[in-house]
């Protein structure tokens, strides 16, 4: 059995922009089918993924507000990054992978505003 774990956000009750800390777990049911689906998704959306992975520029100043180059490295596909997806691609991704039950998703959502200073002060306990 394969279980993949990823986190998003920060455990901190003094950063109003970080409202939640999320831990996601993906339990793979059929790894071969999932690998094939992943490759199919990437190949059928290659040009769109490449376009989404470019630097995002401020419309007035032209400064880079969000760096690209996270899904593609040295001109080759590396990995999917949900942070690079727009709403349309996120919807397409969910629709595509929910067709066949190749994995299950579990998550833990921690509301940072409910954490106490006492809890956050003890980092060993907080992060373990």
Regions found by a protein language model. Give the residues of each.
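Phosphate-ester processing/binding pockets and catalytic centers
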Residues: 1-128
């Amino acid at each position: 059995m394969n279980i993949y774990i990823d986190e998003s956000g920060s455990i901190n009750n003094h950063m109003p922009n970080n409202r939640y800390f999320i831990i996601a777990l993906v339990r793979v049911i059929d790894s071969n089918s999932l690998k094939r689906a992943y490759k199919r998704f990437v190949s059928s959306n290659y040009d769109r993924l490449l376009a989404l992975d470019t630097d995002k520029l401020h419309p007035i100043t032209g400064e880079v507000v969000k760096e690209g180059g996270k899904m593609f490295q040295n001109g080759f596909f590396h990995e999917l990054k949900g942070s690079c997806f727009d709403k349309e691609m996120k919807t397409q991704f969910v629709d595509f992978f929910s067709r066949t039950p190749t994995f299950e998703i579990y998550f833990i959502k921690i509301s940072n505003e409910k954490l106490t200073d006492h809890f956050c002060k003890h980092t060993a306990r907080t992060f373990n």
